[in-house]
Curated annotation (Swiss-Prot):
Name of the protein in question: Inactive caspase-12
Catalytic residues, chain numbering: H172, C220
Phosphoserine, modified sites: S85, S90
Signal peptide residue numbers: none
Function: May function as a negative regulator of inflammatory responses and innate immunity. May reduce cytokine release in response to bacterial lipopolysaccharide during infection. Reduces activation of NF-kappa-B in response to TNF. May lack protease activity.
Pfam families tied to this protein: CARD (PF00619), Peptidase_C14 (PF00656)
Organism of derivation: Homo sapiens (Human)
Gene Ontology cellular-component annotations: cytoplasm; cytosol; endoplasmic reticulum; NLRP1 inflammasome complex
Keywords: Phosphoprotein
Family membership: Belongs to the peptidase C14A family.
Tissue specificity of this protein: Widely expressed, with highest levels in lung.
InterPro entries: CARD, Caspase-like_dom_sf, Caspase_cys_AS, DEATH-like_dom_sf, Pept_C14, Pept_C14_caspase, Pept_C14_p10, Pept_C14_p20
Gene3D superfamilies: 3.40.50.1460, Caspase-like, Death Domain, Fas
Amino acid sequence: MADEKPSNGVLVHMVKLLIKTFLDGIFDDLMENNVLNTDEIHLIGKCLKFVVSNAENLVDDITETAQIAGKIFREHLWNSKKQLSSDISSDGEREANMPGLNIRNKEFNYLHNRNGSELDLLGMRDLLENLGYSVVIKENLTAQEMETALRQFAAHPEHQSSDSTFLVFMSHSILNGICGTKHWDQEPDVLHDDTIFEIFNNRNCQSLKDKPKVIIMQACRGNGAGIVWFTTDSGKASADTHGRLLQGNICNDAVTKAHVEKDFIAFKSSTPHNVSWRHETNGSVFISQIIYYFREYSWSHHLEEIFQKVQHSFETPNILTQLPTIERLSMTRYFYLFPGN
């Protein structure tokens, strides 16, 4: 005979008991370690009482209610941490922020200036600072100056105590590199992608070994529109004139390089050979979508999921067509940002 299914009343009682037991343990630890005082525990408890008293909703729709409860709990712990962060450190000083780097090239000698990119710079700086990163900003650099800035940043002693870093690039670019301020067709001024990865790999930047290294690039990668037109009768597709496929570029040395280049993820604003759009007043579409989805989901989703949500927002082509791509992914674990923790 099959086991009898518990009634809703029994399930509700079980949920309430589990919540109470779980939270009692958390609050005891917070009090014993002087992280939260009695008033702060009481304040959090008032909000969590709502969750316990509505355990029926947990049974009926556990996913939705768990998200609400998690958001309430996270916000209170985040506010408490900001208020008490100076007391948690043993020497009375605030915790050191994790270093992040943002390189923006707006003004060029031969290429057109990237008007509107200041909004991208301010938006990303605000986002990363809210995620706990101390952002170093460098502007209007040649390729050699960008490489020097990267090597100096890789040598920061703060990386020893950090758990990750962000590298954000905003510039013109070619297929596999970021353009410096002196770039033109007759005399390229390019910081190649391989150079960036080489500077921060485990051989040359051991303080970031086994730590996520997130690279975000807002830049065109060619002149193509990145679309094909399909006819409804024959189903044949015709590509734009710049849409030539890249062939023969698959390497077979991944096993050899796996322990050298590890824990990277690069998120680029468009597919190879194609453009990336930027509004002179509102900034780039790619950066604005990153900021939106990070703010919405970084507390609950891992980094790849957030990047995929950004990609999904570009899935249907419209007037301004581009598709961000995740590249050179070598992280072996999911990376959760958990702002406030």
